[in-house]
Amino acid sequence: MISTKAEVLNNKQADKKAVKCVVWDLDNTLWDGVLLEDDRIFLRNEVVEIIKRLDSRGILQSIASKNYAAKAMAQLQEFDLDEYFLYPQINWNSKSSSIQEIAHALNLGVDTFAFIDDQLFELEEVNFSLPQVLCINAAELGHLLDMPEMNPRFITEDSKLRRLMYISDIVRNNSEKKFVGTQEEFLATLNMTFTISSAQEEDLQRAEELTLRTNQLNTTAYTYSYDELNHFRQSDQHKLLIASLDDKYGSYGKIGLVLVECQESAWTIKLLLMSCRVMSRGVGTIMLNYIMTLAKNNNVRLRSEFIANDRNRMMYVSYKFAGFKEIDKTIFLETDLMIIQPVPSYIKFQTRI
């Protein structure tokens, strides 16, 4: 039975991943009152602080509200809060379908979402349709910022800028929709610069965050702590490289990480990941091809660990296109390094090793 206090909606709610996006209802949740019925509505006292604190922690936010979109957005603008919500879904659809739309737009799994509503029916509907979503009764807002799921271990510079980076993505995507020509021609207009660097101590918090947050473009889903990554950074038997991407609209931040174990005659890629935010930018294989080039120049064999799951098939396809083959049906893939794809012509590539 679902508790009316909604401390947890059911046993499945008790063990959730770190939240990447909080989706808010509006009426009697974000504000007191019903927009279409009341003459005036008022922001709940604690809401502004919660929204700004979540934003500073790198947690994205959106809206799923049954309302008239124009009136609701005008009210959010009046409260100076509209800029905090990405891809708001203000319509008469089910809350679960609105959450799915937001997840698709942000390219995030719904298992990293939380949903806040004052109506038990809406919480139950989302819990039934999307049991992976952490559902929170609006009556419990006072405890929200203290929840473990809302407290990332580190708050990095990339975290603080995450919403602004997504807003830049919205501008890019709108430009792409208006562009007349091929995708490659559009990408050429972005003036992208892809940089691979040896990870420095100041990169390690973001590196750990990437191992925890990145699920789709991730070869093994291994997670590494700050201390482990710091060890690899200083080890003669490992290469720990981090990638960043910039274009004419601004920085995507640190978006890629690779860990290579280096033995005398063979190297093994222990982890290769790319942020899903750059999935459509044609940069997904640059790090892999760079490691292949390094291995070839050092006259060593190159293999990679790969652990398949229901989210990372795209990485497997990237490996196959790069010439990697399974070794005796183990978790290892290996390449003969005969063919290494060049960096796309529309990307400026640089290293700081």
Functional labels for PLM-detected ranges:
Residues V47-Q77, P88-N93, R206, T220-Y224, ...:
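Substrate-recognition element of Asp-dependent hydrolases with the DxDx(T/V) motif
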Residues M192-T223:
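Short amphipathic alpha-helix that is part of the acyltransferase structural core
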Residues V34-R53, P131-A138:
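Basic, amphipathic juxtamembrane/active-site segments
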Residues I99-L120, V126:
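Conserved Lys-Pro-Asp/Glu-containing loop-to-beta segment of HAD-superfamily phosphomonoesterases
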Residues M1-L26:
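Non-catalytic pre-domain segments flanking phosphatase-related domains
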Residues Y222, D227-E264:
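Conserved beta-hairpin
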Residues A105, N127, V133-L190, T293-I353:
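Terminal substrate-recognition subdomain of acyl/acetyltransferases
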Residues L245, K254-E326:
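Acyl-donor binding region in acyl/amide transferases
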